[in-house]
């Protein structure tokens, strides 16, 4: 059960993490997936469907960049709606983590 909780927590913050990464710089999906796999141990298979969903929701948009080592790369960038969503999710995340920390701290 603890592993299931960890997986659900990671999935719950995945969109926030992607939006935060893209707020710093445009990126392609493999680069985002590699970073999230390394930093929060999230499987790449979860990230690609999320990127497609975020695009269809209007949070990100794509453009192609020629690559010297193969086919063009599809880069993602935040839209104005994506920036608004990031700010809202950051606010919710801070409030949520403060509440959880208060509860967990009180139980210690």
Can you describe what each PLM-predicted range is?
Residues 3, 84-108:
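Amphipathic alpha-helical dimerization/coiled-coil segments
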